Regions:
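Helix-adjacent hinge/juxtasegments
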Residues: 65, 73-74
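A structural signal for short beta-strand/turn segments enriched in small hydrophobics and glycine
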Residues: 22-31, 59-68
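Preference for bulky hydrophobic residues occupying beta-strand positions
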Residues: 8, 17, 32, 54, ...
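Short histidine-centered loop motifs in beta-beta connectors
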Residues: 16-20, 24, 53-56
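Short, highly charge-biased, low-complexity peptide segments
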Residues: 49-61
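Short beta-strand-turn/beta-hairpin segments enriched in glycine/proline and small hydrophobics
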Residues: 1-13, 33-46, 73
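Short, ordered coil/turn segments that flank beta-strands lining enzyme active or ligand-binding pockets
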Residues: 10, 20, 47, 57
Length: 74
């Protein structure tokens, strides 16, 4: 299995976690919702895979480029 890191594309605050590690996600599946500049931005997986790591919690601040999660793809 190949490990792919998910990075934050914009700075903001984690508003809501949608899934926990161990969950199988489809391509473009939402991992969490980021609040930035009064907008809610879904953070999604680029490919289908299993969420193996989640490095953020609700309320956490993230910066652009932070590694926020990792998925395993076949």
């Amino acid at each position: 299995m190949k490990r792919i890191e998910i990075v934050a594309e914009v700075a903001g605050k984690v508003w809501k976690i949608e899934v926990q590690p161990g969950v199988q996600l489809a391509a473009d599946g939402t991992i969490y919702i980021l609040e930035s500049m009064k907008m809610e931005i879904p953070v999604v997986t680029p490919l289908a895979g299993k969420l193996i790591e989640l490095h953020v919690a609700e309320g956490d601040a993230v910066l652009e480029g932070d590694v926020v999660a990792a998925i395993a793809v076949a």
